[in-house]
């Protein structure tokens, strides 16, 4: 009997221990990522506030990266920027198997529409949501399964054609809704997109004669997050007057939707008689909005002047940097960030790892400018805005810098990394993705949270005031072209904003002209493109681009076109060749005038 009792006790103890071990193992697999790993000695090359450290989760991904999401067990999901380089797959799954914070498993998955603007990647209510340029999809996630094997459901459907600003960012409220951004296929609502001097369509004072892009674009639509195959007509237009939005998030603390919108481009290129290069580099502000139902941001009629802190009428609608029109009646930004910083993600911090200063505040990923020349390109940072009661409670801060790795940034292609996506890990770490290599960082706080204060922010505040990619440039001293060899006046006025000072484009929207087959192998075609413009999609050096190239024949003379094409063909490692005014004239006569003369 005693032996039986001893056996029973021993067996029971083994079962208890084994059960506890299994529970611990199950728990530890899900939570071992919650134990903050060691940071890289150089913080992955980043500058951070005192007490913060960083490590590189993955150095590069073949498909590059747009937005990212982190599951509750630490698995990372990446929206691939380039499906072709990713084996045709649109998503990438990452897992750390040993708790050192570094990726050990990289698995591409999910085949769907493969254009490069598609942005979203979010984990919500047990599903993985992601987007292409036209669609929003989701897949059911299963516990401990890295790559979902569930079917891809289509949640929201947009219709072709493809055009600029189609990114489909998403956000979720606490009532079962998904919010989807619908960018406008236009820069400033012009009759001829991005063409110098072309007027805007519509009357800002007459809703019945409004810009046609406002009917089904340039806004945010709300849908049922759990219903499939919804078209735009099945949703509710929640907000309008937003040209291009990539950064979108719902703040559970204030129970509100927020966005940081991209301002318009090309004041100098389109209106060279109204804007100096410095004014064009400084305007307009990138607007941080709280978005309530019925919101109107004012595009395309108005822009926000970040120096005067007021909305002004766009020149396409009779603006002259002074006229305000009805701008004061429109939604005003919480903050006007510096022009062309390119806000590409927004995240309200809900974790407990960071000091109290960051609780419920907003992190913003600024991808970086393309059109600030002749001044340094700017942005390329992670910013932070402290919040209280749904409103900013202090000035915006530089949270992370050092992504570009060069100073100053003359052309966008000089930047080694461009921050793109933000995600919060289960332990409160902040994850940052970037587009050029697909690199991902994990930022952690290792200091004394109670001691965190102004002193720990001092070095980053100094960067805000002095770094060339962040500070307000001096109009004379910071002009990077003042000491450079003479360039083409036509190129610096009309071409440099898109194709850049080095001719390499921006790697995403605007194609390179350096060593380009469009420049080197068919002179007649090249002249025709300058005269009449070109609409995408087009392939340049193996990559697809979908931005409009405006025709220049209506405002440039034969001599000016010959001069700029000779300059382009004689630079940027192209095949040198002279283009004459007579050759331009001959091509002009071959083309019906209405194709390029819109005046």
What are these regions (language model features)?
Residues 422, 440, 487, 491-501, ...:
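The canonical Cys-X-X-Cys-His
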Residues 71-73, 123-125, 172-175, 249-254, ...:
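Residue-level detector of Asp-centered blade-edge/turn motifs that repeat once per structural unit
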Residues 33-35, 304, 377, 450-482, ...:
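Flexible coil segments in periplasmic/lumen-exposed cytochrome c-class electron-transfer proteins
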Residues 75-79, 127-130, 177-181, 256-260, ...:
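Conserved beta-propeller blade signature
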Residues 481-506, 521-532:
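Sequence/structural segment immediately N-terminal to covalent heme-attachment motifs in c-type
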Residues 32-50, 63, 137, 184-233, ...:
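Beta-propeller domain segments
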Residues 105-112, 116-124, 133-173, 203, ...:
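Asp-box/WD-like beta-propeller blade repeats and closely related beta-sheet repeat scaffolds
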Residues 68, 119-121, 170, 245-248, ...:
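Hydrophobic core register within WD40 beta-propeller blades
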